[in-house]
């Protein structure tokens, strides 16, 4: 078991958003965390990553507790995080963004600038461009590349295809399949169930901060009532 979350409670200020979430991700899986906007997907990922420390519950990574650790400590253990707002450095070049991610992580291994560019060939000709000059899709590729430069064993992805053109979505889907084949486990939070169906094996459905369903992606699509009630498909 690479990631286990038990009875997670988290929120912002006086507001509790996640009310006792329990989920698990096995090594080598792609697992989707599905739900509408406001369901608690982002809060769950931020709590796992230590950005919004859990109020209660337990998060373990490869059997060791990480609740209460700071985000940079969690990253150095081998968890990469790609937020929905990308969070690249706009005044640094693409190459500088990638190399800085490696230096800050304190990890080294399978991923370097060349391998990231093999995964996202469009970045090859943009290595000297500042992050602020990239399109939304290019920034998303760079954000994912930055996470990979930290040599993660687990990737947390928050709404990776939101607002992107269909061609870019297709490319990112293929990239995620290749990342999984390279041995990286993925927990993907998204509301696009059709995209998740193409790359994920299992799913959790989150609604109002509670897990409402756990099962295979095939089981999600076989249950029209489930899709209608929680995913508005």
Where are these regions (language model features)?
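Conserved ABC ATPase signature
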Residues: 130-134, 138
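Conserved ABC transporter NBD signature motif
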Residues: 57-66, 77, 109-112, 118
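The feature captures the beta-strand-to-loop junction immediately N-terminal to the Walker
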Residues: 34-36
